[in-house]
Structure formats: C-alpha cells, structure tokens
Regions:
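Core catalytic lobe of class I
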Residues: 1-224, 270-272
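S-adenosyl-L-methionine
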Residues: 1-5, 226-268
Length: 272
C-alpha cells in the first residue's frame, strides 16, 4: 500500500481481494486432504478495531485513485465484509450490489457443526453518490440467456487447471473476475488491484482487452504475475484460456466473450 500514493493515475475500476482475517489455526478439506486454513501472517485476526483501521486506510487510499465515475468490487466473507460495508458508507461510496458468489464445488464441512460455507460476497460500489457509473446491462443479459442477471452467481471455485498456474492461497477463478470486469468496464479501461497476489485480475483484464496495474507486497507473486502475463501474450494460449472459462450457458454466449475487441497498448513500466 505504500506504493499507491506514488501512482499518478486514475482508474476506471478497482478489484480488491483484501485479507479476510480468517487464519485462526483451523482446519479444512482440500482435494480430499486435511489442510490448515492459515494463509499467512497478513491474514491473522487481531481485533475488530484493527480490522476496521486496516480497511479504512486502504479504502481511503484507493478512493483517491478512482475516476469520478469509477466503481470498486471488493470480495469477502462474514469475517470482513461487514467492516468493509460500514466503511464504504462512511467514506461516501454508493453501494450498488452485494453479489453472492455461490460456489458449485465448495470444500466439505470438516467440523459438521454448522452449514457448509459455499459462498463469498462481492460488494460493488461506485465512488460518488450522484455520479453515474457504467454498467453493461445488455451484455450481462446476453451472457445469462437473454434474462436479467441476478445478484447470485453460481460459478465454480478455482479449477485445477487454474491452480496449476500459481500457488497463491487465495487465488480467485477467472470466470468470476471476467464477469465483473465485463460488467463494469469498456475495452481499454484501466483496472487496479491493490492486493494483486498472482494477478488473476490482470489475466482476466488482458483477456478482455483491458489494461491493468497490480500491487502486491510479495516479490514471489509479482514474479509469478509477470510470467503469467508473458504466457498469455501467445495468442494460442490466450484463446485456450478463454475456452476453458466456465459460467457461460452455451457456445453462443461464450462467443460473445471471445469476440475480438481493439487491442490496448500497455506501458512498459506496468506489470500488465
């Protein structure tokens, strides 16, 4: 986050996957194996005031880098989403939707003491209360079988072929990121991810002909990001990625996404 104030640029859209603060030494099941839920020191819960202070700080900094008509998407769970919603309102954002991402393949409930966690929430908000935002309503309708797209998205969690691209513990699926990028931006738009990780947001942005800047504190993940970008510069691999995306009802709808749009030019100083 120390880098963000130094960036002299305004963005059309932000996607943020901040710490959920759920690393509590618990256990889960992944690919049939018992695994720790701990993601790293950055995800450790301290106390409610710490979570609020953290979210307030990064949201203030990100807001300064948004165009007046820009929107922001923020993913979370019950561990952090209430704090984020409260602070968005406090900072005069306008909350537009709370998307419920219902995973079609969630991990099973290990403890059997409560309902299986199968959803994440994604808040969509615009920077200003009264400044209109962009929403590609017609495309979302087309991608949903010519029906209005609702705020519950049934999409799979990360697929094995995507997980092989990176070992980041909180990687998001391309299908989710592609949908929200197409919904809220036009081709050539600038997208920022302040918690980029291995830059799946950047991959989705570039596949959809948008421009991207990612920030992360881990050099290892920045190197992975650069390698992933180099990989999709091969048109054959980029097309392969697009065809593997899930969440389209039929081939006609997939073709809408595969339609060639104008290629943007990327600055050499940027990750994407």
């Amino acid at each position: 986050m120390d880098l963000l104030p130094k960036i002299d640029h305004k963005f059309d859209m932000i996607f943020a996957d901040p710490p959920y603060f759920l690393s509590n030494d618990g256990l889960s099941i992944q690919n049939g194996k018992i695994v720790s839920v701990n993601k790293g020191k950055w995800d450790k819960y301290k106390d409610y005031d710490y979570v609020n202070d953290f979210n307030r700080k990064w949201l203030k900094e990100v807001r300064e880098k948004m165009k007046d008509d820009a929107t922001i998407w923020i993913s979370g769970t019950m561990h952090n989403i209430f704090s984020i919603g409260q602070i968005l309102t406090e900072l005069n954002f306008k909350i537009l939707n709370i998307i419920t991402w219902q995973k079609s393949n969630p991990p099973p409930n290990f403890s059997c003491r409560y309902f299986t966690h199968s959803t994440e929430q994604i808040i969509w908000a615009r920077k200003n209360e009264k400044t209109p935002h962009y929403f590609n309503y017609e495309l979302m309708k087309q991608l949903n079988g010519d029906k209005q797209m609702k705020d519950v998205w049934q999409l799979p969690a990360i697929a094995p072929w995507e997980k092989s691209c990176t070992k980041h513990p909180t990687q998001k699926p391309l299908s989710v990121l592609t949908r929200l990028i197409l919904a809220s931006t036009k081709p050539d738009a600038w997208i920022l991810d302040p918690f980029a990780g291995s830059s799946t947001t950047g991959i989705a942005a570039n596949l959809a002909n948008r421009r991207f800047l990612g920030i992360d504190q881990e050099q290892e993940y920045l190197e992975i990001s650069k390698n992933r970008k180099i990989e999709i510069e091969d048109p054959k691999i980029a097309t392969k990625y697009k065809h593997k995306l899930q969440g389209f009802n039929n081939q006609k709808e997939l073709d809408l996404f595969l339609t060639k749009e104008p290629e943007p030019e990327y600055g050499s100083e940027l990750i994407f």
